[in-house]
Amino acid sequence: MDRLARLGGRKWLLIALLLALMFLLLLAGFATTRPVDSRPKPPLGLITTLPLFWSEGGIEADLAKDAAPHPAFTRLSAHYDIMPVDDLETWVPRPKQLLLLAQPRAFAPNELVRIDNWVRQGGLVLILADPALQWGSLYPLGDNRRPLFTSMLSPLFAYWGVELVLPLEDKVPTSMRKIGVFNIRTVTAGEWLPKGDSAKGRCAILAKGLLADCRIGKGRAVLLADADFLDTAFWEGRGMRILTGKDEFANMALLRALLAALQDDKGLRGDFVEK
């Protein structure tokens, strides 16, 4: 009897294993036969001094087999067709193209005019402007290859009716900030303040000064007073990633949500408003 019971138990165990294997094969077949999204990615122009496209190790490192772009760039490129913009004078925007200025280089006056005119004619731009960037770099201060320490777009911001400042009362530079449903971590974030006559742009200042949503002519500019939040040190959370497979902070989710709101030409409400 005991022998028959053991044989019966093994039989049911074998049946259970076969059923589990069939279930896994069905899942694999479903995953491989799901329709692939063939829609083209929205175009996104990018101007930045941050090491997002390439590493800081020089051309040898960039050409190495294991060279890889920054994780923030990899995340964005999964959803956008990212194109570097080197020369604003010769730049020809594609239809419905967004523009991301992430702590960009200093622009000549004629380039600032080009940005302003493009936005007024219906352009959509997200600007990450940091008053005191802490992003680590291999290059010394003053080296053109180093990310820009402070935003140089003050003339454009003033024309649109806002001013970027660094709050002096922050005793702890690294801070957790809540923007609506997004919990982010960054360092030395700035603040937007209204400045002078804002007739050239209508800007709503949100999230305790961290965001400004500006209607400029027929277009729109969303301004975030920080760029360090793109650094993986502030959002990836390797220990948390090992345990959950998710980011520790929602920095990249915020970036994607801002671009999506800009693309849909919707105001920053809903998820961006503190409940």
List the model feature ranges, each with a label.
Residues D2-K275:
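Short, surface-exposed patches at the edges or C-terminal ends of soluble domains, predominantly
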